[in-house]
């Protein structure tokens, strides 16, 4: 196993060309890609094929400044039993990220101001990622209720209300900022009854 492959496997299967400033190292990466030992994820980012099919991948390296949201955040906060179909990652609306179709990542384009609140740092499977917090995740469920289905939205709200560490004041603040306060109020009234 050469130095490139050793470094890739020791870092969870993903390397960047910035880690290898030498031209000869770059050529080794290109040759490893040609042999099928590495897959080009995007410009300057390469991965060992097996790493892409793990249950968790290094989102921060593939989509820098991306925020894990929706299904993955609901699963992390134990708000939903729905298995995430892919990694849901929010990025700024004006930003363009080229994603190969083999990666199980679904991008959501949010306004910049919506990416600046309700976000926390989490360590999952040895990777540091940014993810929406519990209250923000509930508001996102209400916001995307027509896309995800009313059953999933109701499940998220019901499970949130059962949590001991819920923060209804913060939930109301986030709902106002995301313009879903009235809809959330209706769901909360129904769930409490």
Regions found by a protein language model. Name each.
Residues 1-15:
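Short amphipathic alpha-helical interface segments
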Residues 11-19, 28, 33, 45-193:
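Nucleic-acid-binding surface
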Residues 22:
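Alpha-helical residues within the helix-turn-helix
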Residues 36-43:
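A short, conserved structural fragment
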């Amino acid at each position: 196993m050469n130095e490139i492959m050793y470094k890739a496997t020791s870092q969870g299967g993903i390397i960047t060309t910035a880690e290898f400033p030498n031209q000869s190292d770059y050529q080794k990466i290109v040759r490893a890609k040609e042999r099928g030992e590495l897959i080009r994820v995007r410009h300057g980012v390469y991965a060992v094929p097996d790493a892409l099919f793990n249950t968790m991948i290094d989102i921060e390296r593939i989509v820098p400044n991306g925020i894990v949201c929706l299904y993955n955040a609901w699963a992390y906060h134990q708000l939903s039993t729905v298995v995430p179909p892919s990694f849901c990652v929010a990025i700024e609306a004006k930003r363009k990220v080229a994603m190969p179709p083999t990666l199980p990542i679904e991008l959501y384009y949010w306004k910049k101001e919506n990416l600046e609140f309700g976000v926390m740092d989490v360590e999952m499977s040895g990777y540091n990622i940014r993810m929406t917090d519990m209250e923000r995740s509930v508001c996102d469920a209400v916001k995307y209720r027509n896309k995800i289905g009313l059953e999933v939205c109701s499940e998220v709200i019901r499970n949130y209300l059962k949590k001991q560490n819920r923060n209804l004041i913060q939930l109301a603040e986030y709902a106002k900022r995301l313009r879903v306060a009235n809809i959330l109020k209706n769901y909360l009234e129904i769930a409490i009854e």
